[in-house]
Regions:
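Iron-sulfur (Fe-S) cluster-binding modules
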Residues: 1-92, 105-117, 131-170, 174-252
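Short beta->alpha junction loops
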Residues: 91-99
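N-terminal glycine-rich "phosphate-gripper" loop used for MgATP/nucleotide binding
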Residues: 119-123
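Short, well-ordered alpha-helical microsegments
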Residues: 125-127
């Protein structure tokens, strides 16, 4: 890394960005998949000049919205619109991240050249892009599917649904919200069959796995502790402000 004449905070940020680039497997990420082509095409039917914006982090690793995918989508859209007799001019750029305002500022000098923006980031990035440029229609090109772990190259498994009330300490590190088809907090339903889920027979019962894990750890007594039902009606868009940054948030 070049670090001469570099602000210390920017140097730290750059260090972690480059470190994350080098992680190709074994990481945690937001996993997404590209929307059906016809859906994307329909969203853009009234626009003739669109900037497709990729994201170089999570969606790039899972091959849904990085620089390569931006090029592929633009080629498909351009060809389809020509066939329909309604050609479209498409720009292409890929930001380091769309969930970081600092990187969204890079579009400031070009965004006015386009009628709309087509984002290939996750749902958080798409919303942040729309917030940064509120006068431009912003359309999603991908569907955000889950927070997952990279089991192997090209193989992602859902592990967390960001419920905001983690119970992994009581369930042996196995998430009942994610792994149980019914999201049960206090033991299995009556349909579990030989350790299999009644809804998905190829899927193990989450509470069978929890029982086996806790038993192996000598902590089976935890399975008898009642976990209160999550009050989903109290859910709202969540914000996390790290200690020491409260004044900055209040000022902003």
């Amino acid at each position: 890394l070049e670090f001469s004449h570099l602000d210390p905070l920017k140097f730290i940020r750059k260090f972690f960005i480059n470190r994350n680039k080098q992680k190709q497997k074994g990481g945690r990420m937001i996993v997404a998949k590209r929307k059906p082509f016809e859906e994307i095409k329909t969203m853009l039917k009234d626009y003739k000049k669109v900037l497709t914006v990729g994201c170089g982090t999570c969606v790039a690793v899972c091959l849904a919205g990085g620089e390569k995918e931006v090029g592929i989508l633009n080629a498909e859209l351009s060809m389809a619109r020509k066939i329909d007799g309604s050609p479209i001019e498409l720009g292409a750029t890929t930001l380091e991240r769309q969930c970081d305002m600092e990187f969204l500022d890079e579009l400031e000098n070009v965004v006015d050249e386009y009628e709309a923006l087509l984002s290939m980031a996750c749902g958080a990035g798409i919303q942040f892009l729309a917030e940064r440029y509120p006068n431009k229609p912003v359309f999603p090109a991908v569907d955000t599917t889950f927070i997952g772990a990279n089991r192997d190259v090209g193989w992602y498994e859902e592990k967390c649904r960001s419920c905001g009330s983690c119970v992994l300490g009581w369930t042996g590190g196995i998430c009942p919200v994610t792994m149980c088809a019914k999201g049960l907090y206090n033991g299995p339903c009556g349909g579990t069959d030989n350790g299999k889920c009644e809804i998905h027979q190829d899927q193990p019962c989450a509470w069978y796995l929890i029982h086996e894990r806790l038993a192996a750890q000598g902590r089976l007594d935890l399975i008898m502790e009642f976990q209160p039902i999550t009050a989903w009606q109290n859910q709202k868009p969540r914000t996390l402000v790290q200690p020491g940054y409260e004044e900055k948030k209040e000022a902003g």
